[in-house]
Amino acid sequence: MSDVEKVDGECSASGKRERLTLKLGDKLKVPPSLARGTSTGKSFTTVEVRSKKRRPGEYISHDDKRRSGLNKAVSGLTAQEQLFRINAINMADSISAKEKELAAARKAKEEEELAAAAAVVEEAVEEVSVEGDVPPVEAVEAAVPDVEEVVAPVATPSHSNKSGHDDRGGKKYAHGATGRHKEKEGVSIKKVASSRGASKHIKLDIENALSGLEDKRVTRFSSSTHKRRSSNVKSGRRISREVVISDKMTVRDLALAMAEKAQDVLRMLSHVGVEARMDTGLDSEVACEIAVEFGHRPRVVSIVKMEQELSDVCGDDFVSEPRPPVVTVMGHVDHGKTSLLDVLRKSNVAEKEFRGITQHIGAYQIDVDGKKITFLDTPGHEAFADMRARGANVTDIVVLVVAADDGIMPQTVESINHVKAAGVAMVVAVNKIDKSDADVGRITNELLQYGVIAEELGGDVMIVPVSAKTGENIDKLQSAILLLAEMLELSAPRECRAQGVVIEAKIDRGCGVVATVIVQKGTLKKGDIIVAGDSSYGKVRSMFDDADRVVTSALPAMPVRVLGLNAIPKAGDTLIVMPSEKQARDLLWHRSEINSAREENRAVPSFSGAIMASMDSKVEEINLILKADVAGSMEAVSCAVEQLVHEEVKFNVLHKEMGDVTKSDVLLAEVSSAVILAFNVRVDAKARDLLRLKKVDVRHYQVIYDLVDDVRNMVSGKLKPIVQEMQVGLLTVRQMFSSGKSGTVLGCYVTEGAVTRGATVCVCRGETVIGEGTVKALRRFKEDVKEVNRGLECGLLVDGVKGVLAGDVIKVLEIVERMRGVE
């Protein structure tokens, strides 16, 4: 039987691997094909590993001549060691082949880079020769004095250099041809062998040459694109540009405006005698001087003027087109404003409001006979005065709703004043004419004293009697609005950048910041960069109309809900579309500078005056945290709190924000002993779990009336009560008795009320007060009693009063504390 037994048979043509089993023997005999590493389709398994020490000096050679004598060389090794040797030989062969491939690839890449670099240098040489300042050879040598390169024209073909060798760690590596000649129009570059062994760094040398040429400002090249870039920058010259200098400009801002390094600007400032840092504000004169030193043309523009230039969305080049009217419905609370609007837009918003009272400003657009009308519904409570004023300022026509049964009310008068201040047209809708006590004539006469004269009385105000309940005369009201809008000839440009007014703003859980906007000019599109107010900007991610339909653009007078702002704007802020995000940030920066300048101009009380005021005043403080659903509601809540401030009670609003009550709100309220006023918002899950452990007062409201009453009660609870002395009894002294050590007992008759033991009494003789004291003992006959009523006689022992005579009058007093109210 042979030493090697086939187990799995012959290797198939498909390339299946044969398995060889090596049997026991004195020495392991390996087939020559396997020993030479040529058998790649076979695998073998050792049956037994025989341990035997290796003879000294035995090794496996890498040479093919020694590989044939493998059995003799490894006869002293174990079977496992011999297999390791064989595998190492095979792996070494594969690694050697891979190294050769990589070396060839590297060599080809180096040749390509060398050729490209040589081409760039040739272009540099040509450029220098064109300039005529320095000959080509001298220019390159002057740029790179330390590199041994020779640039010379040759007439013969280039020859490759001999290979160089370097011995590292006993191994030899072939460098190959490191220096080569590139022919182009009779010019070649030859690398001369360096004494420092830098023959393989020709690429670095060429890059240094290019850098030196760039320092001489001859031309600019790009080695990455292998193309020459022409430049206007020459030695000693800078690009001059117009630099806009504002009133307040920091060193960093000036450097950015000039496109210069901030360190260079600081160095120039130190040369002119100004010590500054990056955030130091510069005077406009100093900034202009620095700009001139850098060779620029300064132009001084005030911050206010710059803000106006940035916020100007359209000029005279845009043609105005007709637009729908914006109509605001105003009036006293519960006079039927929302119900009337529901009839106009054929909806039922009033029933969705809590108790039927509007708490937010709403924007809707309806279609009447093919013509659109935009309506704004405002709350009627006095706390929403700013909201109504805002509605009057953005509107074209005001529909003043007056209940026919109630007549003119305080918020009706306030709405009339807003209309007059805004200078807009007005239509009076006398609502609830379906009631039995309705009197339209009385309403017309009452309006006269406020300067509202009806058309039938010779004025210019249309008065339309309507009924939101039955729908009577609703068509006449619509016709009156359209007629007035036609007379006003309303128009606005559509092609310019959009501008609008923020009506409401809030934070939505799924959408982020949502702002309700009325577009006034231009067309607001999805993707526009917008700025709202002094701190909000962003990109319009999406828009929705009043019916929650997605829209991609909004024309003038169209109300939309805009998503994409980074912060909540204030209700009433102007929304502007900017050409770029950079200009949007610049506009916000200018507005912040204007606001900071206004803050600096305000009078600041002195430190000593503040200390004296705090020492003299003993004011009770109430810490509050305000939470509301929208910006308009937050404004109303803040207004209500400010109006209820008393001279003895002060509200400290620690934090106010739109959105639900959060965990941070609860923690802040705990450490500051604050009360959380939550208007139309809830408490989120994490804050709800925390409230079970913390003693924090969270008060929820859905109607502004309830919030105002509760805040008023909070103020009353902090005020010191009014102390009053009330007379509850009257006695007449008839006789005095001496009781020895106890004192004088007064025999009295109760003429009014009653007297009790321990009561406070005042002894009077005519109009003169003899003294005041306390009833120490009270007896009827010889029995101690607690109280003696009217018409009975009793004996009193009064502590603290002496010299009482018969006929004196004793008044029984009671100290009463009464809570103080807030108007």
Swiss-Prot record:
Residues 36-48 have a biased composition (Polar residues). One of its GO terms (cellular component) is cytoplasm. Residues 322-491 form the tr-type G domain. Residues 331-338 are annotated as: G1. Residues 431-434 are annotated as: G4. Residues 467-469 are annotated as: G5. It is found in: Cytoplasm. Residues 30-66, 156-192 are annotated as: Disordered. Disulfide bonds: none annotated. Residues 56-66 have a biased composition (Basic and acidic residues). Residues 356-360 are annotated as: G2. Keywords: Cytoplasm, GTP-binding, Initiation factor, Nucleotide-binding, Protein biosynthesis. The keyword Transcription does not apply. It comes from the Bacteria. GTP binds at residues 331-338, 377-381, 431-434. HAMAP family: IF_2_B (MF_00100_B). PANTHER family: TR-TYPE G DOMAIN-CONTAINING PROTEIN, TRANSLATION INITIATION FACTOR IF-2-RELATED. This is Translation initiation factor IF-2.
